[in-house]
């Protein structure tokens, strides 16, 4: 009976429901002395298991939805970062400020500050796998975009006519990125907790649905 794939979890619960149906069909001849095997207990366990399966499905759907929402929220980031850099380049910002802006933009675009030496083989996985080519995690992207906002805020002549490039608009955009990322983190935690709770009901030693079925 035991199966631990996503489909398998539901199958285990369905099989348990079949077992209860057979036990119920026996009528009064099914009268175990062990409380956990009595029909009231079996039905209660089945209800709990069905609830946990449904909770996992709901949590996964939520996680998938907010993950897609986050991807959409971050989609304009690179092109917006390029527009910011282009505007900074025509202000009276110092050469160092422009250099800093280029560094931030490189991070947002996922570029290295210096080219990779393609003549040197990359470290093997056994050696630790090497350093990531880019800082493309959503946390890092948000952090670097915040740095870009701080930088343009320090340039007196940064007064774009384009609404999307104003500090207020950039701040709103950054806040939306943070919200989208936080939503995914929270949904991931909820999804993980739902799976843990489901597994406790289904697979706990002695008291879980699977072990109860094997009794």
State the predicted function of each range.
Residues 1-215:
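Basic/polar low-complexity intrinsically disordered segments
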